[in-house]
Structures are given as structure tokens and as C-alpha cells.
Amino acid sequence: MTPPPRTRARRLAAPLTAGVLTVGALTALPAPQAHAAGSVVKVTGAQGDWQLTVDGKPYQIKGLTWGPSIADADRYMPDLKSMGVNTIRTWGTDASSKPLFDSAAAHGVKVIAGFWLQPGGGPGSGGCVNYRTDTAYKNQMLDEFPKWVQTYKDNPGVLMWDVGNESVLGLQNCYGGAELERQRDAYTSFVNDVAKRIHAVDPGHPVTSTDAWVGAWPYFKKNAPDLDLYAVNSYNAVCDVRSAWEKGGYTKPYIITETGPAGEWEVPDDANGVPLEPGDRAKADGYTRAWGCVTGHRGVALGATMFHYGTEYDFGGIWFNLLPAGQKRLSYYAVKRAYGGDTSHDNTPPAVSDFTVEGDAGRVQAGRDLTLAVRATDPDGDALSYEVLDNSMYIDKGKDLTPLPLTDLGGGRLRVTAPDRPGVWKVYVKVTDGHGNVGVETRSVRVVPPTPSGTNLALGRPATASSYQPGYGDCPCPTANAVDGNQNTRWASDWSDPQWLQVDLGARTAFRHVQLVWEASYAKAYTVRTSDDGQNWRTVRTVTDGNGGVDDFDVTGTGRYVRVNGTARGTGYGYSLYEFGVYG
């Protein structure tokens, strides 16, 4: 059996077109169609020579997964149609789906309508159902899904039904060993039960089930004979699907329900130890390559819905979306060309041919100047505008991109201020042409605390605190961690105000600089104090607008003891410091 792919996080926040159904949910069905108007869709032909037909006519799926709000369907359907797209795919179907089906039908587009089953394909995608014993959940889905099929089967926007998404893979996040095998058998058997129920209600549309790798297909072959065809999400390995199908002895055709450029889980790490994101040109080529491999398996691969017609301008959106914030990328035009759309009169995006970080991208000092060198050209000669953004995914799983104030130094050189929080950040350059097109490239930088001049008087000295965390998460987090010179260890306090940490310098000593390297649990308000006897304190610095990261400032102080005294936490947790440096 083909081994499962490297464990991956969800590519985007699950872009369900309709809400995920849960046990006990009460949902009102929209009014049924006034009359039967749906197409009859069939998988026809014989072994190795299949085709999909709609009302008796051959139909090759030229599709994209759907990302925008259903309310925007009429806005985006004409654009999809102009790309040569004839199909979109969703992950969920419920009462909210009707406007999408109606809009699709009105524009000559059909929908692969999904039904979501837990656990889905990645951590956080859904709960861990026991498909061997949880009859309540299974009965709920067996009741709910056919209701929506009955409601929408005559809608001309429906192409087929797709039961589940990546759950054969996703079950590995819930079970292991022999129990995992039993659960996978039980899940695929349940999918077959759903397929039979759907066929009983709607014999006019095929039923499939999507998973994340071809290693799921033996389970479907064994346990789900009532599926009309298979479906798989495959990115960098999409050109290997044909070989897996041929070696597996399968007797059903398949479709690719997600594909595109190499995903985060498939690429090597860069010099900073995070996934090396392909550039815009490589991503565009990934879609072209994927479509070539789909169409190359004639009579078996019946088409694809490539990933992703989405508009999010966040970490996952930059990796995969064809039009983040409605701006079209090279990938958008690659898909349009693949599907036969007319690009002869299109104004196309700027191309970023080079993007580098000046200096050492592995040691960028927090809060200091960061200079980027960008080389971009526009095929239409348009004037270009630049924007720089950053993202903290590899620090705290943040998805948002934050625009940074920049200074254009000329000659493609842009200066911004580096983030003030240590860790590996993604830095993006966005180049727009004023005609709705964008080029985006990204690099990683490892942000480190600035190196103060002088000697760290606190390094290795005795430290005490009002409290510390003896055991939570990665703790124990004792006071000594804050003065050990190691940015990977931390002191953490109780979850209350006030809290303090102090270091004993051994003798009355003059110091001129303090550096605090905060973990995510930072101080919003605090003071730095000094004392000769540990009893009587003098304040040398007051901060009321702390935002975490690295606080690096000059002071004028003398004393044996130096204390940071937190009075207002920035989070619901305690105070946590990687390092407390006192410099003379």
C-alpha cells in the first residue's frame, strides 16, 4: 500500500461552502425545486475507456475548488466561465447551498457538492468519530445527507455528490496500529452505506468520495463498491496517481478533487528550517503540470477541480489562491490557459524574478532595519507598486499577513523594520500593476534579539521570582532559565498580577542597558527596579504599552539586585521571559 503523505496542516481554514453538519443539528430545508430540471450525469464506458456524460454528452471536468462567500457567487461565476471552468467543488452541502447551485447553473457551471464527514484530513479538521461504534453520528449523517440530495437533485447546478474529504488519512490523527486499520475499514464501509442511500434517492448523479492519497483507494475498493468513481487530492505527487491506479487493479475511474503546486508538506526546508515556498512562476507551472498529467490518463482520469479559487490574503491564501483579495496571479492565467480560456487580450501579472534579503537572513536583529532587494518586470510595461508584509505562522501559527511601512531606496531596494519578536518569520513582497494583477514572492528570516554592547551582568547569576510554573506545557520553567543565555528556555509565572523576577548581581554594580526577550506571554505594563539590599527599590524604567517581543532599552541604574515587576499581563496567561539581560 502506498504510504501516507507527510502529515500536513490544513491548507486553509476549511473553506466549507456550507456548514459542517453535527449530531443533533436542526436544519430547515429550502423549498424543493418546482419541477425536475436537473441534468442526468453518468459514468459510462468500459474498463479503461470511461467518460463522464451530462445528458448524454461527454463532459470533462475543468474545475476549481470554490472559496468565496456564496453571496458573491453571481460576482465570480462570469469570471470562472471566462477561464474555461465548467465545474466547482465544495466541501459541504446544506440549506445555504441553493444560491450557489442556482448561480452556477445560470452561468453554465456545475458543482461537485460535498458532504463533510469527521475527522477530515488534518489536525483540527474535525472530531474523532468511532466509525465502529458511534451509531448516533452515523445515523445522523445517513438521515441528513439524503435529505439534501432530495432537496437539490433536480437543481441543474449539481454534477455529482462527494462524501467525505481526506478522512481515511485523517483517522491517523485519532487512532493507530490495528485499530486504525479497523477504523479505516469501518469508515469506508460507512461511505458505501451513504452512497447507497444517495443512489436510492437520486440515481441521476454519481457519488464519489475524496481522500488525500491513493493509499486510501484499497480501502474503498474493498469496502465501497457502490461508489461510481474515486477521487483524490494530490499536489506534487499528482503525476504518480496514474501509476498507482494501474498497479492497484482498480475497476473505477477517478477525478482529482484538489491539485496544484507543491504544498507546504511536500517541499524541503529552507536555510531557516521552514518549508521553502515555491515562487509564483513555479506555482503557475505546478497547475500546468497537474492538468497535463490528468489529461494524460485518458479514459480513466475524468478531470480535476484544482485548488483554489479563493480570495483570502493570508498564509494559506498566498500559497494556493489564484486571486487573493481579488488580484490575479500567474497561477490564475496558467489555469485559464490549461482550460482553454482566451488570454490573448489579458493584461497579465508582474513577474518577480529575484527577491533577496540583504545581509544574513538567519540573523536579523529584532526591531532593526531590514533591507530587501526585489527585481520585478511587467509584461505589459505597467508601472509597478510594492508592498512588504510579514507573517508569524512558524512562531505562533498566525495566518494573517501584516503590511509593513517601507522606504523605497530605489533600484528595487526596500527598507522595512524587522519584527521585534524572535523566531522565523515569513516576509512577502507584493507587486501590483494597477490592472488587478499581482506578483507575490516570499522568503523567511530568522529574527534574533539585538546584541547589546558590553557584558551581560545577569548571565548565570542567582535569580528568584514571585512564582514559577512547575509543570504546564513545556514547563517546568524555573527562574534560572531567564538568565541562562539560552533563547530556547524560559521562566514562566503564575497566571495572576502582579509578578516579579529579580537577579542578584552579587555586589552593587552600575548598569546602563536592559534587554527583555518575552515569550508569547508578555507584560503589557511593568517596571524595572534596582535595589542595594533587596528591600528598598528604585524604579529606573516604566513601561505601560508593552507588546511583547524584545524590549531593548538604555537605563541609568546602580544596585545589587535588578527586578522586572509585571503589573499588567498582555495575555490571559502569566509572564514568561526567555532572557533577562542586564548590561554594564
What does each of the following model-derived ranges do?
Residues 1-36:
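Secretory targeting and sorting signals
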Residues 46, 54, 58, 81, ...:
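Substrate-binding clefts and catalytic carboxylate motifs of secreted carbohydrate-active enzymes
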Residues 46-48, 53-227, 404, 414, ...:
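Active-site mouth of glycoside hydrolases
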Residues 509-520, 564:
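A short beta-strand element within beta-rich, extracytoplasmic domains
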Residues 565-572:
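Short beta-strand-plus-loop segments that form exposed binding edges in beta-rich domains
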